[in-house]
């Protein structure tokens, strides 16, 4: 008896499903491709419990008769190609004929379909690959496919699904990619019985503004280029619209969404110096190419493609994008500086009462890492040789970064670095006053690093991660306090969140409250920010919240972090002073004092170094003085 046997179809389909169906979003993608290929002009997506309970796709496409419906759930059965040469002329999104077979083998699957010319439709059911039907059924023209209890018979795969917020985020991103690529189709998305959008008009800019905020679509740079080899069209973001994640870059070949590193790099390099560190431009680009010049059959999910001549593609995309962003008007609109905030309001304004203090825990006595290096810094930077320098302590202070300098704030300086009020010197200053005519030996390098003379040489501090460490420890301590500390806004801010953002917000709302955010639902996907932690810069409340949610979600998908730890990391990263922000001597001095008052001043919350020391001995060796 031979030891090699052909696998039963039901087993083969489950194996195939491991490549084709990785998560609920994979089901959505495959079914939407079929709906588009059917010629549908209206598509509805219904989701329950992030696709675990239900994924339903309803379209008004051509529909199927009973024979085609039965064949559609068979492996390698398709109407889109008939021989190998057809792969070189693909105009459809699907072509392998394995999606429905794979999906139906790992779910409770129901298909209803009807041709326009037929008075009655048909229904077909599959429970884990066991087919029932087809049988007559009343239904609208087109096709409706319901996928329930995904992976019910593959518990290992179901176990490895992420949180509902993460899984729905992938679903929403998948649907959004199709919505932007097919404006001629009416799109409707319903999640847990709530309609998230219903697009009836073929206006891409309108759809972009829905997803990214009012006016977003109108402010984009439109790109149009064509030659005998390829067409390029789409939209690009201006520098003020840059994002820190690459979720918002969409590349299509013949309206098929793809992932391609070369295209990402070409766009990134075309923007060049217009980008700040870690920024990426928004891009929605459609490339039209002869199907014979691109192979889409190189990836199970059809996301990756192989170009016949990748260099030619890049040589067109790069100059087109570069020319578009170089010729666009990037000058910012003039804005009127806000008048000083009244006493007691959030942000920078008139001197506030010294009775308004932050409720952060006193760090004095907690730090065990400030010792010799802090003394070296104080003695070297302020010429306090021989003086007794105690570890820094942080008393309750006011959120008025630089308020004692007497100079206006630089436009990009983060006001959230806490400094003592004018009538409340720090403990270190009280015991070691610095003569007013003695300039501290502290400098800022390229608005990025702080350089200090210390008794034994030189100390270099990364200003962003230093402030990140300070904010992180404060956030952890505040969330562990009995009573949250929140600075109420004079004018509450309404924010419209994306569906996946709202899911994350609901997940972390309690921790946000303990951190100091006072937020209440405001109908639909909107929330109202009524209060924020005192560290948050005035006018930056909405941006900080949305950036925190994005950072939290990214951390959750990559790292296994406790919820409060994740939120504290997200808050500190997004709220810290950034590279490019100029600090004056007093601001740098206070940042250093706050850093050395933390429990772990040498590394940031993500493990990056904060401080580098260079001793006189090492410098002497470099110059051959030893």
UniProtKB/Swiss-Prot annotation:
This protein's GO cellular component annotations are: mismatch repair complex
CDD domains with a match to the protein in the record: HATPase_MutL-MLH-PMS-like, MutL_Trans
Per UniProt, which keywords does this protein have? DNA damage, DNA repair
Ranges for the region named Disordered are 385-413, 418-437
Select a single GO molecular function from the record's annotations and give it. ATP hydrolysis activity
Is DNA damage tagged as a keyword?
Answer: yes
Q: Name one Pfam family in it.
A: HATPase_c_3
Record's family? Answer: Belongs to the DNA mismatch repair MutL/HexB family.
Instruction: From the Swiss-Prot or TrEMBL record, give the protein name.
Output: DNA mismatch repair protein MutL
């Amino acid at each position: 008896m031979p030891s090699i046997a052909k696998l039963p179809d039901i087993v083969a389909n489950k194996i195939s499903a491991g490549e084709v169906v990785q998560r609920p979003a994979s089901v959505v993608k495959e079914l939407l491709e079929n709906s588009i290929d059917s010629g549908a002009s209206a598509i509805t997506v219904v989701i329950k419990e992030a696709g675990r309970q239900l994924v339903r796709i309803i379209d008004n496409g051509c529909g199927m008769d009973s024979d085609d419906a039965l064949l559609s759930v068979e492996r390698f059965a398709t109407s889109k190609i008939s021989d190998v040469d057809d792969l070189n002329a693909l105009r459809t999104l699907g072509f392998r004929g394995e999606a429905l077979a794979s999906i139906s083998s790992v779910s409770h699957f129901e298909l209803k379909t009807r041709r326009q010319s037929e008075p009655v439709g048909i229904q077909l059911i599959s429970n884990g690959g066991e087919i029932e039907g087809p049988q007559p059924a009343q239904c609208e023209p087109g096709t409706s496919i319901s996928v329930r209890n995904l992976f019910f018979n593959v518990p290992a795969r179901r176990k490895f699904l992420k949180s509902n917020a993460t899984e729905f985020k992938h679903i929403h991103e998948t649907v959004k990619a199709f919505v932007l690529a097919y404006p001629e189709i009416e799109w409707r998305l319903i999640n847990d019985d709530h309609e998230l959008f219903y697009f009836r008009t073929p206006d891409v800019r309108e759809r972009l503004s829905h997803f990214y905020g009012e006016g977003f679509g109108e402010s984009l740079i439109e790109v149009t280029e064509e030659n005998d080899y390829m067409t390029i069209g789409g939209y690009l973001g201006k520098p003020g619209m840059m994002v820190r994640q690459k979720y918002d870059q969409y590349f299509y070949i013949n309206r098929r969404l793809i992932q391609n590193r070369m295209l990402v790099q070409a766009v990134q390099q075309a923007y060049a110096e217009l980008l700040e560190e870690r920024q990426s431009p928004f891009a929605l680009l459609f490339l039209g190419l002869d199907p014979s010049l691109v192979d889409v059959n190189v990836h199970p999910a059809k996301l990756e493609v192989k170009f016949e001549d990748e260099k030619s593609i890049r040589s067109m995309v790069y100059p087109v994008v570069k020319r578009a962003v170089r010729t666009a008007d990037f000058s910012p609109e003039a804005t009127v500086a806000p008048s000083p905030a009244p006493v007691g309001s959030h942000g920078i304004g008139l001197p506030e009462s010294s009775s308004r203090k932050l409720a952060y825990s006193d760090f004095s006595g907690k730090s065990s890492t400030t010792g010799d290096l802090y003394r070296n810094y104080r003695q070297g930077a302020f010429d306090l040789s021989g003086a007794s320098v105690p570890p820094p302590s942080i008393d309750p202070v006011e959120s008025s970064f630089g308020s004692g300098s007497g100079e206006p704030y630089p436009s990009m300086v983060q006001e959230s670095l806490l400094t003592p009020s004018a009538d409340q010197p720090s403990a270190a200053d009280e015991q070691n006053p610095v003569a007013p005519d003695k300039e501290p030996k502290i400098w800022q390098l390229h608005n990025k690093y702080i350089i200090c003379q210390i008794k034994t040489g030189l100390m270099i501090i990364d200003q962003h991660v230093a402030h990140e460490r300070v904010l992180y420890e404060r956030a952890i301590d505040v969330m562990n306090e009995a009573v949250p500390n929140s600075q109420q806004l004079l004018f509450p801010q309404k924010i419209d969140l994306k569906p996946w953002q709202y899911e994350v917000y609901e997940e972390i709302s309690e921790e946000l409250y303990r951190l100091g955010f006072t937020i209440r639902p405001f109908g639909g996907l909107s929330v109202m920010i009524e209060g924020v932690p005192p560290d948050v810069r005035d006018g930056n409340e909405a941006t900080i919240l949305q950036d925190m949610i994005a950072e939290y979600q990214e951390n959750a998908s990559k790292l296994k972090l406790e919820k409060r730890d994740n939120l504290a990391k997200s808050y500190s990263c997004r709220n810290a002073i950034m590279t490019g922000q100029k600090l004056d001597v007093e601001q740098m001095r206070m940042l250093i004092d706050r850093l050395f008052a933390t429990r772990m001043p040498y590394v940031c919350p993500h493990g990056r170094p904060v401080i580098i020391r260079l001793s006189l001995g090492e410098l002497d060796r470099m110059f051959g003085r030893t």
